[in-house]
Amino acid sequence: MSDITYIVIWLDATRYCFCYLSMILDAYTEEIVGWSVGPTLDTEYPIRALQMTLERIKDVPKEQRTLIHHSDRGVQYASKRYVELLTEHGIRISMTEDGNPKENAQAERLNNTMKNELLKDKHFTTLAEVTAAIIVAVSFYNEERMHMSIDMMTPRDAANCTGELKKHWKSYRQEHIKAKQAEAQAVEAAIPMQQPAVTSLARSV
């Protein structure tokens, strides 16, 4: 699950600008597996987050990877280089169908946690300060912050856990996909099957 969110940098008492945090979340373990922060919305920074993620799976044979990269339809995620990186590494691509935030709910929730919990009340004046704070926040999120959705484990513990994780929160995206599949099946069932014409062939001898 991937997304980009903004963070305020104060230039003085009244003027400010934004920097942009790109993060990639493992939807299964809730672990932040890649991130990057930059001064613009250039594709370069989401690519850095993706490269951090790819480094973690470099020893997994390509044919054994069953990964799906999900994001909104931002130009960064649809860019030629970003798509090439995913396909080169055998990762399937999934994108939201519209602007409904529930279709990327886990990433949206992570943005909220990062900005309104882990970075709450912090006053940044440089990009370097933001980067240093993100390093600490990601470490805390992955290694110390317990999650109800993964049975009160930390994401790092969940990543190291053997067997299937017990997930407590429903996936709005999975519900959406199932609803679409059921709708398609209902339409298909309503279409009468056409019997192929039977042709009799006489062979002369």
Regions found by a protein language model. Give the residues of each.
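RNase H-like DDE/DDD metal-dependent nuclease/strand-transfer catalytic core used by mobile genetic elements
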Residues: 1-23, 27-135, 139-140
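C-terminal domain-tail junction helix/linker
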Residues: 87-91, 113-205
